[in-house]
Amino acid sequence: MTTLTVAKPRTRPLISWRVRKLLIGYSYLLPAALCMIATVVVPILLAIKMSLYADILYKPQDYRFIGLGNYLRLVEDPVFWLTLRNSVVWVFGSVLLQFLLGFAAALLLQQAFTGRALVRTLTLLPWIIPGVVVGLIWEWLYQPNYGVINDLLIRVGLMQERVAWLSSPDLAMAAVVFTNVWRGIPFFAIMLLAGLQAVPDELYEAAQVDGAGVFARFWHITLPLLRPIIVVATATRIIWTFNYADLIFVMTGGGPANATQITSTYTLLQAYSSLDFGYAGALSVVLLLVMLAFTWLYLRTTKGLEDTE
């Protein structure tokens, strides 16, 4: 007697392999996405909601929905427009000088010399010191009576009398920008140094054989290959500097006479000094839009330059 084995029909999986592979990829991204939503998206939505209400902490009885009232107040606030102008000076003055000096430092650190490893390590020192500590150090250096900067400039004959750097409306912004530049140079130096080390030496050797000089090699080899790093690093610094308030809070508190008051410090003062969270929310939303606009404009401009090349 012959036994016949009937093959069972192959069951089709409920989810195809392609869909499962896609779901696996999304599952890896889910924790980061949830973290991003919790730390970025939710605070932005809460700030937008807050900006639509009259929310003064010591006047709970006045809490009510006012729509765009805080934004209309912002448009009519002369201090806001002053802080916006100061923010532009603060951001672009700081980032431009940080980039130029950081690029120069990266080119120097790329060269071979005795003690190069030690110098590269020391270059990071301004960057790893907390911002509050940097502010306290430079506040002491700028001190008019016993500060090192005044004493040094008088000794070398560049000044005849002591200057109150942080108390002068004409000099305070330059002083805090210089401090921020000193702290931010290592960021660009290390980023660009990493890019320089990735450029193949064969390109420079071939260009030198063809008769290209130092400037030609820099312009046609170094700069184009470093452009992606420059774009990302500069955009990152623009965003960070727009939000960076530690130095100004410690060194000047936004003074004298709002000469160093930027939009981020003004927002914090409205929230935690005036306790006007509704107006602070409107300021934070506008600051976010300004940052996004400047970043988009910068990325659009740099992309246009790449396309023309």
How would you label these PLM feature ranges?
Residues 21-309:
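A structural signal for multi-pass alpha-helical bundles of membrane permease subunits
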Residues 1-19:
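Short, Lys/Arg-rich, polar N-terminal cytosolic tail immediately upstream
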